[in-house]
UniProtKB/Swiss-Prot annotation:
Official protein name in the record: Aspartate--ammonia ligase
Principal subcellular localization: cytoplasm
Biological or metabolic pathway of the protein: Amino-acid biosynthesis; L-asparagine biosynthesis; L-asparagine from L-aspartate (ammonia route): step 1/1
Organism this protein belongs to: Bacillus cereus (strain ATCC 14579 / DSM 31 / CCUG 7414 / JCM 2152 / NBRC 15305 / NCIMB 9373 / NCTC 2599 / NRRL B-3711)
High-level lineage: Bacteria, Bacillati, Bacillota, Bacilli, Bacillales
PROSITE patterns listed in its UniProt record: AA_TRNA_LIGASE_II
Designated gene of the protein: asnA
UniProt entry keywords in alphabetical sequence: Amino-acid biosynthesis, Asparagine biosynthesis, ATP-binding, Cytoplasm, Ligase, Nucleotide-binding
Length: 327
């Protein structure tokens, strides 16, 4: 039966250790400045992240003006807008401590309706919009993960070390070609188990089979220049997503992707106009799950062991039977 390697109190202390170390190194190595972030945005702005395009944001109206607001799913679009508003230049970027509510999340060991992540965004020049630049950025972030594991091992040697020296890059099409009989999720399990750490490139567009590896909103990532960082989780014995990131759409790719998804109505939103008219800067960015990170590096079996959220009674009871104690 599962046995946590730390008490709840020890876990809380270690969570701070994980977050403090990672935040400090992320800012230094990607040259990012921390900024304050909104919990909600106006509906008409189009700044909310609509994820896979089907999740419902929490909406409410403001008493003062009656304006409709949405609690954010993530800050994928807001960050790009902020870089423009704050006058950042190529090579400069920002990050923020993002908290969100995703009401339609299907709850399980790795998914909660409460989301906490380091959301970051950086301005790039046109010639940087390449797979090579994407991979270089992934390697920088992976280097932080490696150093974090080493740092924790010095304090908590019983946590062990599992990450390989290098992260492996593979495209979603290469995965389909390699494992045509498997579902996309099972392909992720297979490749993560084989290598320990992988970055899957190209998520959102249809593969040669006609199926997508996974859904992505049409209006933030360029589907050819994005991907997910996956580790093999030693406790769950499955693939484990730590980050979704990518080079963002330019006017050409946004135009193409909105057409593919049948979302031409979004062209009228301020955010989308800013991209289509080349007003907003070209960027790369992503979200790095804080609770996911703590769950992996502290070797936890459930995300509820590293964050406070709301869980159905039957799920709490099932966890108790497995010796999993949720916050």
């Amino acid at each position: 039966m599962y046995q946590s390697l730390m008490t709840v109190r020890e876990t809380q202390i270690a969570i701070k250790e994980v977050k403090t170390f990672f935040e400090d190194q992320l800012a230094k190595r990607l040259e990012l400045f921390r900024v304050s972030a909104p919990l909600f945005v106006t509906k008409k702005s189009g700044l909310n992240d609509h994820l896979n395009g089907v999740e419902r944001p929490i909406e409410f109206d403001m008493l003062h003006s009656g304006e409709e607001l949405e609690i954010v799913h993530s800050l994928a679009k807001w960050k790009r807008f902020a870089l423009h508003e704050y006058g950042y230049e190529a090579g400069e970027g920002l990050y923020t401590n993002m908290n969100a509510i995703r009401r339609d999340e299907e709850l399980d060991a790795t998914h909660s309706i409460y989301v906490d992540q380091w959301d970051w965004e950086k301005i790039v020049q046109k010639e940087w919009r390449t797979v090579e630049y994407l991979q270089k950025t992934v390697q920088t972030i992976y280097g932080i993960f490696k150093d974090l594991e080493d740092h924790l091992f010095e304090k908590y040697p019983f946590l062990g070390k599992y990450l390989p020296e290098e992260i492996v890059f593979v495209t979603s099409q290469e995965l389909e070609d390699k494992y045509p009989e498997l579902t996309p999720k099972d392909r992720e399990h297979a490749i993560a188990k084989e290598h320990g750490a992988v970055f899957i490139i190209g998520i959102g567009d249809a593969l040669r089979s006609g199926e997508k590896h996974d859904g992505r909103a049409a209006d933030y990532d360029d589907w050819k220049l994005n991907g997910d960082i996956l580790f093999w989780h030693p406790v769950l014995q499955s693939s484990f997503e730590l980050s979704s990131m990518g080079i963002r759409v330019d006017s050409k790719s946004l135009d193409e992707q909105l057409t593919k998804t049948g979302e031409d109505f979004k062209r009228e939103y301020d955010f989308h106009k800013g991209i289509l008219e080349d007003v907003l800067p070209l960027t790369i960015g992503g979200g790095i799950g804080q609770s996911r990170m703590c769950m992996y590096f502290l070797r936890k079996a459930h995300i509820g062991e590293v964050q406070s959220s709301v869980w159905p009674d039957d799920l709490r009871e099932a966890c108790k039977k497995e010796n999993i104690h949720l916050f």
